UniProtKB/Swiss-Prot annotation:
GO molecular function annotation: ATP binding; magnesium ion binding; phenylalanine-tRNA ligase activity; tRNA binding
Entry's EC annotation: 6.1.1.20
Compartments where located: Cytoplasm
Gene, per the UniProt record: pheS
Record bears the keyword Ligase: yes
Quaternary data: Tetramer of two alpha and two beta subunits.
Main localization category: cytoplasm
Family: Belongs to the class-II aminoacyl-tRNA synthetase family. Phe-tRNA synthetase alpha subunit type 1 subfamily.
UniProt-listed PROSITE patterns: AA_TRNA_LIGASE_II (PS50862)
Protein name (database record): Phenylalanine--tRNA ligase alpha subunit
Entry-linked InterPro entries: aa-tRNA-synth_II, aa-tRNA-synth_II/BPL/LPL, Phe-tRNA-synth_IIc_asu, Phe-tRNA_ligase_II_N, Phe_tRNA_ligase_alpha1_bac, Phenylalanyl-tRNA_Synthase, tRNA-bd_arm
Length: 326
């Protein structure tokens, strides 16, 4: 038997093994139950008693040498496999980290929050109501009779003659006065709907309306509150004027303008003293209580505050536009 040749062949096969399964096949070929070294040990019985010990020793030494080669190759393959995994999973610490982009409040939401914050400091609470409204709360109780132009089909989205999408949040004021007794100080922000769509109108938009009902409420109080609100909202000492106007639910009524940077008056909201008929509709005695109401378009104020020219931009979900307000 040529043990040196067997060891040399085993070493060659072990060194060319590139994975654990190939190496294990080499081990079985040489060291398994039917392997070459096992067969050599079985052949010792054919030798004389004098030859057997020396031959057995040489075979065992060769077996140990092959086992050592297999072990070393196995360690090397495991190390290579680990290095390969680590290289694949490595983190390049010089690579800039991935930032998590934070969202921001929509400009309309920012405006509503700003309005609510100001009036909360004056003791006004926030009230909400249904967007699908009935004729009484949307029109009748607001001194808008059946033949009034505001009730025309081209302005209002009707489900049936007495159920519609609300055209203003004034219905919230009616519901509040039905449920609570004066004194009252509320604002009612929310979505409203009118059949109109152009650069300054959308079918759905946001309003904030306010109401104060108590004894001896005056137009002077209304002017003072709205003047302070506009200066606070626009963060400027504005020139403000109250221009006589008409609303069926207030008398007297006024529209409020502010002087723009271009030297022209800009309409920003409407207001007036609550009409006695509105108070009577909710069983409040107009001989005892008076009140004022005001209403403003949120998108209109947002456009003026941020210099936006097209109201429709607020509803187009263009991130290039919205990211400017973060």
């Amino acid at each position: 038997m040529d043990l040196d040749a067997i060891i040399k062949e085993a070493e060659t096969q072990i060194n060319v093994a590139q994975d654990a399964s190939t190496l294990d096949a080499v081990r079985v070929d040489f060291m398994g139950k039917k392997g070459r070294m096992t067969e050599l040990l079985k052949g010792l019985g054919k030798l004389s008693n004098e030859e057997r010990p020396a031959a057995g020793q040489k075979i065992n030494q060769a077996k140990q040498q092959i086992q050592q080669l297999i072990h070393q190759r196995g360690e090397l393959l495991r190390e290579q496999e680990m290095n390969s995994k680590l290289a694949a999973e490595s983190i390049d610490v010089s690579l800039p980290g991935r930032t998590t982009e934070m969202g921001g409040l929509h400009p309309v939401t920012r405006t509503i929050n700003r309005i609510e914050s100001f009036f909360a400091e004056l003791g006004f609470s926030v009230k909400t109501g249904p967007e699908i409204e009935d004729g009484f709360h949307n029109f009748d109780a607001l001194n808008i009779p059946a033949n009034h132009p505001a009730r025309a089909d081209h302005d209002t989205f009707y489900f049936n003659p007495d159920v519609m999408l609300r055209t203003q949040t004034s219905g919230v004021q009616i519901r509040t006065m039905e449920a609570e007794q004066p004194p009252l100080r509320i604002i009612s922000p929310g979505r409203v709907y009118r059949n109109d769509y152009d650069q300054t109108h959308t079918p759905m938009f946001h309003q904030v309306e306010g109401l104060m009902v108590d004894k001896n409420v005056s137009f002077t109080q209304l002017k003072g509150i709205l003047h302070d609100f506009l200066n606070n909202f626009f963060e400027a000492d504005l020139q403000v004027r109250f221009r006589p106007s008409y609303f069926p639910f207030t008398e007297p009524s006024a529209e409020v303008d502010v002087m723009g940077k271009n030297g022209k008056w800009l309409e920003v909201l409407g207001c007036g003293m609550v009409h006695p008929n509105v108070l009577r509709a909710v069983n409040i005695d107009p001989e005892v209580y008076t009140g004022f109401a005001f209403g403003m378009g949120v998108e209109r104020l947002t456009m003026l505050r941020y210099g936006v020219n097209d109201l429709r931009a607020f509803f187009e979900n263009d991130l290039r536009f919205l990211k400017q307000f973060k």
